[in-house]
């Protein structure tokens, strides 16, 4: 777990400096970015979660998913965007300000959200 956390911190550094980090694991795919939007094509059998890595992500808008939100604030002390799924061919996660991580997780056989 120490290396997983180190990878997230390194991804945060990349986002602060204008980049986007991608972390791949066994059944997990994460994107770390700041102050912009990302489009994520539908993945059957996967869930989608959004986390604030900075103290606050403001202006969070999530569309194309079962649970959407518009111009919402996410905080790193409260999990608001966990375990979502696609409702269209593409999910869009927009962050006006702050550093976010979108984590895609492969669902186990028979698992549904």
Short names for language-model regions:
Residues 1-39:
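Anionic-ligand-binding alpha/beta catalytic cores of soluble enzymes and soluble regulatory domains
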Residues 26, 33-113:
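Long, charged alpha-helical interface segments
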